[in-house]
Amino acid sequence: MFKHTLGAAALSLLFNSNAVQASPVPETSPATGHLFKRVAQISPQYPMFTVPLPIPPVKQPRLTVTNPVNGQEIWYYEVEIKPFTHQVYPDLGSADLVGYDGMSPGPTFQVPRGVETVVRFINNAEAPNSVHLHGSFSRAAFDGWAEDITEPGSFKDYYYPNRQSARTLWYHDHAMHITAENAYRGQAGLYMLTDPAEDALNLPSGYGEFDIPMILTSKQYTANGNLVTTNGELNSFWGDVIHVNGQPWPFKNVEPRKYRFRFLDAAVSRSFGLYFADTDAIDTRLPFKVIASDSGLLEHPADTSLLYISMAERYEVVFDFSDYAGKTIELRNLGGSIGGIGTDTDYDNTDKVMRFVVADDTTQPDTSVVPANLRDVPFPSPTTNTPRQFRFGRTGPTWTINGVAFADVQNRLLANVPVGTVERWELINAGNGWTHPIHIHLVDFKVISRTSGNNARTVMPYESGLKDVVWLGRRETVVVEAHYAPFPGVYMFHCHNLIHEDHDMMAAFNATVLPDYGYNATVFVDPMEELWQARPYELGEFQAQSGQFSVQAVTERIQTMAEYRPYAAADE
């Protein structure tokens, strides 16, 4: 019924390209003299723990559209990407930001499992953008391919399946060579999937009340209160001012009861070693439970007093304040370059994150629990096949994977993986002067092993669930195992240090299918498929909700998209 626009030459490249295995490549290692040293803060001093923790608002759909194929609802949203200013320092000038709906972080999506969504991202900013719903098994055309940009004055409709189990996803910019600056200035937000199975566990709940988003970033400011740009940075942008939900070093009033915290490291380059401490004994780490990681709940809670989290990782923890009534608890960040695992520069105050002021009593009894059994995690079937090897390093000034940069269009496709295949990938960081959080699009993976490393760190107990990002510390090798399903297409994998990503530490893999796969596959294989490209718009039409933004036009557009059945394979 529908024709694809993928040319013969492109099809040949996708289905016949040979994977490039890891081989020795020239590497230049930066000096490591800064490790384990604390240096003076460069940004102006900020009055810590004086501003309450902000909670991003919940995004509401503009309308619902009936799917003509199955009769189910599709929720339609509009998000305007636009510049705005924000008074960060109370006694200095404002900072120039660009955010989703003119806020940073962007609004939080809360979507029930099984409800498809179409989100129209409208670029009313000055720079191109591309949006990645991180952790979703979106079709390639809606996955935020780095070159699939939306220019200013255009919009793109992203169609999301929301078929996965409950989990904390996030959406952020992914535009070629400008992801760091776009995300740094505000283009990031949470996208939460919910489902009845998780709700039935009776974990601490109530968004913004006892279920708290915690989006971590690290920035740097000029003497007048504006942001220092990331442009021109080639190694890492650490930042010396820690933010939670866009606010430097906030505080939160809490009750002496259990709270669920959804941590996301949305920083450009900074990783964290998070722990809770009583201000009466600041060097003593308090126990808490990790209940979920990138791809949803663990099988069992993991008890710990220290949580390593790198860029793009998500962890959900439950901390019980009931033993600390009337006290002050701080969330802290481990110094010494995160215990020697990281290479981050420690500034005067980057060991502090935020403060919790615990009330003397609860307003109502705490009936929430943390069950010993959270769920049966759908791990991929084990494989004994030889792992593919991918070496993350540096070739001259360029960050590369197996010596290949993303700008090398002819060679950046490093793997062809038949849909439905389980594979092990060996991720290698031979460098001593950098670390790499590695994100593989489309899939959830199991962390099988972690070896070598300067600290002999193994797989942490809270890494026992499914993930989509794994942190490669200095000189570490990590093996991950994933089921490459449910969709064919060309997808990215890359380092999520956004400076490294922007400077080409990114590659592609092709989840392949036979030509007679049996349903409308090829129209979604190419992430640059013309059918789904961004479209120009008139600002007046958007503001008046007319033309392409009228209810009739939006309904027709979404129903046409649904007729292609982009997510039919997930139901088979």
Swiss-Prot record:
Name of a matching Pfam family: Cu-oxidase_3
UniProt-recorded Gene Ontology molecular function terms: bilirubin oxidase activity; copper ion binding
Annotated Cu cation 2 binding sites: 134, 172, 496
Residue positions with a glycan: 510, 520
EC number: 1.3.3.5
Residues of the propeptide: 20-38
Residues the record lists as binding Cu cation 4: 436, 495, 500, 505
Signal sequence region: 1-19
Sequence positions that bind Cu cation 3: 174, 441, 494
Cofactor binding: number and manner: Binds 4 Cu cations per monomer.
Segments forming domain Plastocyanin-like: 98-194, 404-526
CDD domains: CuRO_1_BOD_CotA_like, CuRO_2_BOD, CuRO_3_BOD
Family in the record: Belongs to the multicopper oxidase family.
Record's keyword terms, sorted: Cleavage on pair of basic residues, Copper, Glycoprotein, Metal-binding, Oxidoreductase, Repeat, Signal
The protein's role, per its UniProt record: Oxidation of bilirubin and other tetrapyrroles.
InterPro entries given in the database record: Cu-oxidase-like_N, Cu-oxidase_C, Cu-oxidase_fam, Cupredoxin
Superkingdom of the organism of origin: Eukaryota
Claim: Repeat is one of the keywords in the record: yes
Catalytic activity: 2 (4Z,15Z)-bilirubin IXalpha + O2 = 2 biliverdin IXalpha + 2 H2O
Co-factor requirement: Cu cation
Binding annotation for Cu cation 1: 132, 439
Protein's name in the database: Bilirubin oxidase
